[in-house]
Amino acid sequence: MWSLLLLAALVGQGFALKNVFDMRIQCPHSVNFGETSVSGYTELPPLSLQEAEQLVPESSCNMDNHQSLSTINKLTKVIWRKKANQESANQNSFEVVESEVSFKGLCMLKHRMVEESYRNRRSVIYYDLAGNSTFCKPTVYMIVPIHACNMMKSCLIGLGPYRIQVVYERTYCTTGILTEGKCFVPDKAVVSALKRGMYAIASIETICFFIHQKWNKYKIVTAITSAMGSKCNNTDTKVQGYYICIIGGNSAPVYAPAGEDFRAMEVFSGIITSPHGEDHDLPGEEIATYHISGQIEAKIPHTVSSKNLRLAAFAGIPSYSSTSILAASEDGRFIFSPGLFPNLNQSVCDNNALPLIWRGLIDLTGYYEAVHPCNVFCVLSGPGASCEAFSEGGIFNITSPMCLVSKQNRFRAAEQQISFVCQRVDMDIIVYCNGQKKTILTKTLVIGQCIYTITSLFSLLPGVAHSIAIELCVPGFHGWATAALLITFCFGWVLIPACTLAILLVLKFFANILHTSNQENRFKAILRKIKEEFEKRKGSMVCEICKYECETLKELKAHNLSCVQGECPYCFTHCEPTETAIQAHYKVCQATHRFREDLKKTVTPQNIGPGCYRTLNLFRYKSRCYILTMWTLLLIIESILWAASAAEIPLVPLWTDNAHGVGSVPMHTDLELDFSLPSSSKYTYKRHLTNPVNDQQSVSLHIEIESQGIGADVHHLGHWYDARLNLKTSFHCYGACTKYQYPWHTAKCHFEKDYEYENSWACNPPDCPGVGTGCTACGLYLDQLKPVGTAFKIISVRYSRKVCVQFGEEHLCKTIDMNDCFVTRHAKICIIGTVSKFSQGDTLLFLGPMEGGGIIFKHWCTSTCHFGDPRDVMGPKDKPFICPEFPGQFRKKCNFATTPVCEYDGNIISGYKKVLATIDSFQSFNTSNIHFTDERIEWRDPDGMLRDHINIVISKDIDFENLAENPCKVGLQAANIEGAWGSGVGFTLTCQVSLTECPTFLTSIKACDMAICYGAESVTLSRGQNTVKITGKGGHSGSSFKCCHGKECSSTGLQASAPHLDKVNGISELENEKVYDDGAPECGVTCWFKKSGEWVMGIINGNWVVLIVLCVLLLFSLILLSILCPVRKHKKS
């Protein structure tokens, strides 16, 4: 083992990439009772015959390999060669050579080896060889106890130059076998096979190994002749033993033949009818050529005198195992025949053999493991959210359009746990898990992070900080209103004068600007008038020397005196008496405004009253009376705003918060409702119908419409298979095409085109000089069959809803279909039409558990199906296997001195692979609450993709005299509450509701505090005690949630927890979609004051320390006010 690890560490990267292969072993996440083992295998590239004979398997796995595999096993090696003295090809132109060869680790299992390896916690590693005359392809097999799944994640196996990485993959199956995306548990009882209608049928891959053991109980040839009805003699002296099988890579050993085990019977039947099993072709070897030399007999072992085994010699790519055991000897004569097909046909009595290893599909009866719902939790982590999904029975599918779902799964006890990260929390997180749509409301995560941050900042008083934080962190306007209310109460006596002073300073600044601007405008108007008068009477005010326009007469006289003498009239600086020089000086002169300022001083300003600026200066913002008035007014306004904003914004169409009670409708005319309802939504309508003549007479009306149920009568078409198409050319020089039986003749689906006696000099290999003899057989066959889905054809489809009406004391229910009505004495409820994507004749294909939804096929092949069509390879229930047709044309391609090659111009891609490539072009659908049999499927649509047109008419002709009194009496008691107030997830209130005076009563129970109601549940009460759970969203820290019926509520209420940093549970969309309408009034001003009072009382009763802390802060602000703004002292006159 250490040499293997050292070699693996020293090899280069390129070598490792070229010679490392994967072997994947699927493990369920629970350990079965019994000696359950898991197995896997992998195909390896070819080696030369000499290298193959030196192979020894090695393992670095922490489970020891079974010791018996290290023993040397001897076999009879049979090869063929051309005769040296033959000039033309015929049945005598080649010969066989027998010899003894030894292998270590070849697939020659001993009696009780697998059972001992389970008890001793050892692995069984071995290999098989499929070879021709020059090279062999190894196939490595491994059987380990199921406990290895809990002990290892991966390990390394070495075989010659190759390294096999064994990867233990956890499936989401509890104990079953993963097939078609579902977990299948086979049943070994024969009675289940006889009553197939009661059980499911699945095609499971099985691997079997021949165990040679001399004992009269193991007369396998006798069992074969009995099963085939042959009349062979001397079966007692033939080989004895049995096959040990692992079903689906995960099962306890199955022993064949065994009459009491149906699984063994199916395996034994498969070995007899298709003894070669699945081929060993590597990818790219689907198209290959065989050159058949002919049939020949050999001596097994080579020391016997007579020939006792018939074989067929070939040259080309080896596709089937070269190991077998002679059937004619009870001594266990093992055979290694590279380049020869041994005769495995058991319909003849002599010269045949049995396969050492068999691999193929068998049909078994059993049941599928139930699909359990998921629980999804999320918590904030950095900038995003960290989420976990749990499911009791495993998670078969989990996706999210906005999260990074890892494929590395972990298991915790009997539940599967998958962790994933969501990068964004600015929108709700949507997760599809086990066919259910879960929504994580990230608003609650943000609330929790806010509470955590505030509590951490004020960690000296964690209780007080938490109580304040849960109010401040409510999202939206309500949180800001809470912050404003607390700040005003605690620090308003300091902040009000400070804010008022800041506002006064800003106002005085603008008032000063306005006052200065007005004075300047008045002075400019005076200058303009002076200038206009001067120009009218004496002329221009422009200096003749410097051309400067003067504003006053005094300025003009100064220019006339100074400019002529070359002086500046403003600063008396000497300059050249030219216009250019003087104008340049004016640009830098600092005294050009001298005459303007002198004039401004002589102008007497207009007397202005006190004005805005003076009024602002005189405002007494430090007055205690002013501060008290503003503090009280702000508290009242902010309390009203806080209460009005305390209602949580609803998610349409879930719930609209309203006040207590039920709306009333005066029946002047018939009451008619006409609307469209999504298929996933429930609808509740509740009103009091009042007499238009007498308002005191009323009748209670309650209508409940359940979500849409879809029921389809179907025909079970069976299982759809994926497959690989193989094209093989088989050429032999002489004889008719029917002379040889090729291994693919035993495949479930095959087709052959023969070109008999058509050889010519231009279409012959060099060793086949004959002309007009022999055969070229072009064979098509399907292998690697894998069931991928289950198909149902819709015969008829029905959309229905259950409708219940409570009219007074009258209670009636009915399930109505599309275009159907429910008519009572006073009400008529109709489904006028349904918008749907299902129609008669469609085919529903489920590529996995039916709980995960399926695909709708409008054009599903029904009769003549070609390979590549939907339904090309089908396994119908209780009917023979259906193979596709191959409509393409064959062509025999010939070249001089080469073996002919067959070409096929038809489709070579399976229908399943074509559907996967274009799956986005098909309509899909999700399912919830699905129930199914072979004849009928019923489910509900969780996405609301379908819609019903609903029409409700309530007649105005109501006998109010007799119907006004309702004898039903309802008693209410709040029993328990879970969840949090003010959060996006909400709370669940459990109510104990008692009903007396009538047997049944359809009504609604609400979850309310003193002011408004946050959720309701429509329920049919039975006489006695009833438990009702109501889900609501909203409320505040002071809300005491009660169970209410109409305006009557339970005597006591319960307070929900505060939103915190706990994990947020996902909401099932199917449970979340309901439309409730009872016409109750919205919350008004009185309701707001009730909410404010309830909040204050909640703080006092819940955590009175918070109130003390707030009062201490208020006192501190008053002291600070007296220091910063002391009271003005008035002197005595």
UniProtKB/Swiss-Prot annotation:
Instruction: Identify the residue position(s) of the site Cleavage.
Output: A646, A647
Q: Which residues are glycosylated according to the annotation?
A: N132, N233, N345, N397, N926
Q: Which residues form the signal peptide?
A: 1-16
Which pairs are disulfide-linked?
C27-C149, C61-C155, C173-C183, C208-C245, C232-C349, C374-C433, C378-C387, C403-C422, C450-C473, C733-C768, C737-C775, C749-C883, C763-C894, C778-C902, C804-C813, C821-C830, C861-C865, C968-C998, C991-C1043, C1008-C1013, C1044-C1049, C1083-C1087
Pfam (any one): Hanta_Gc_C
Name the PROSITE patterns on file: ITAM_2
The ITAM domain, residue ranges: 609-632
Tell me if Zinc is a UniProt keyword of this record.
yes
Q: Which Gene3D superfamilies match?
A: 1.10.8.1320
ZnF regions (CCHC-type) run across 543-563, 568-589
What ranges are annotated Lumenal (topological domains)? 17-485, 648-1103
Q: Which residues lie on this side of the membrane: Cytoplasmic?
A: 507-626, 1125-1133
Q: Which residues cross the membrane?
A: 486-506, 627-647, 1104-1124
| GO terms for cellular component | host cell endoplasmic reticulum membrane; host cell Golgi membrane; host cell mitochondrion; host cell surface; membrane; viral envelope; virion membrane
Q: Give the region (Binding to the ribonucleoprotein) as residue ranges.
A: 514-531, 586-603, 590-601, 609-623, 1120-1133
GO BP terms, alphabetized:
endocytosis involved in viral entry into host cell; fusion of virus membrane with host endosome membrane; signal transduction; symbiont-mediated suppression of host innate immune response; symbiont-mediated suppression of host TRAF-mediated signal transduction; virion attachment to host cell
Q: Return the similarity comment.
A: Belongs to the hantavirus envelope glycoprotein family.
Designated name of the protein: Envelopment polyprotein
Protein source organism: Hantaan virus (strain B-1) (Korean hemorrhagic fever virus)
